Amino acid sequence: MARKYLTMDGNEAAAHAAYAYTEVATIYPITPSSVMPEHVDEWATAGRKNIFGDVVHVTEMQSEAGAAGATHGSIVAGAMTSTFTASQGLLLMIPNIYKVAGEGLPAVFNVSARCVATHALNIFGDHSDVYACRQTGAAMLCESSVQEVMDLTPVAYCAAVDGKLPFINFFDGFRTSHEIQKIQVWDYDDLKDMIDLDKVQEFRDKALNPNHPRQMGSAQNPDIFFTTREACNTTYDEMPAIVQKYMDKVNAKLGTDYKLFNYYGAADAEQVIIAMGSVNETIEETVDYLNAQGQKVGLVKVRLYRPFSAEALIEAIPDTVKKISVLDRTKEPGSIGSEGLQVRSGSGIHRQIRSWLQGHHSCTDHRCLQQRGQEEIHHRHR
């Protein structure tokens, strides 16, 4: 499928794809995500239409908490709804994300991931904001580059409607959100062809309506709450396959090979890095360099972070691997092992795994990462 090329940053790429599936956008600006709702507002003002033939209704609220509450209200009323945020703004949305996920509503929260202020303010990219949402019940999809943001944002929207779960669709703040690239851009006709319109209608039919009222948001005692809460397990079990289904639709249209976990590197790799986000592009260069020197290394790129599919991870890792390094772009004080232990428990690996915190070091080329990373691979994982 031929697509036109345009020059844009990650925020605009996300906004372009999000606008196609959005009927209501509830917004509030916060760096570095502000450009996304600015584009949506600009396009709506200009009369641009989504795939449903409508102009997006944009409402700016008083805060991110208000934007999340309006998202909840809009999605309950049957409108395909998006919002855009980062960092402390995302934290203000957490109470409503719990509700939206618990009620099985397909809202999409587009996030340019940014450090959460702790001892000091930091507006640059890490994953501390999205990690804070891991137990909300929202599915979480990550992109590594501007092109991936364009390609995979539709997957979040299509899978949300099909699988009846909200999505946090995220990419690295500044490193991806503000990186300007010449990329291939979706045509809205192709995006309309990708979504299951019957699922969209099914979602709309369940909307709150005074003509056919129904009860929701009841208070339950522990015995009933436990039972009904466990009932959602099958939804999460089925979501990875649903996400892969829409990745396959993207692959069929674009000739790509997007998977829940993509492997890059030597087929007989003995050392592998598992990482998520913009660092993957640098690691790919590092892998090429090291393999050219005779080493056997590879990279597993995490795309669907929640629900986490152990089966897909195991399938992505070559059988020859002896050592695994897991890059974690968040400091979690008090935790033990963090993402390394998740890989271990999810994959059935029973060898010693130690965490390596991926910090904000300014190196951007493979030589720098090689120098810093190989010592970790060889010494911290002996």
Language-model segment annotations:
Residues 119-123, 242-258, 275-283, 303-309:
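A general structural motif
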Residues 7-13, 248-271:
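Glycine-/acidic-rich phosphate or pyrophosphate-binding loops and their flanking alpha/beta elements
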Residues 52-56, 167-262:
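Conformationally flexible catalytic loops at phosphate/diphosphate-handling active centers
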Residues 123-173, 197, 346-357, 367:
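Conserved thiamine diphosphate
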Residues 41-44, 98-101, 157-159, 184-187, ...:
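Short, solvent-exposed amphipathic alpha-helical segments in soluble enzyme
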Residues 267-295, 308-315:
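Redox- and metal-dependent alpha/beta enzyme cores, enriched for Fe-S-associated oxidoreductases
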Residues 1-132, 137, 154, 173-174, ...:
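Thiamine diphosphate
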Residues 323, 327-382:
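Peripheral docking tails and interdomain loops at the edges
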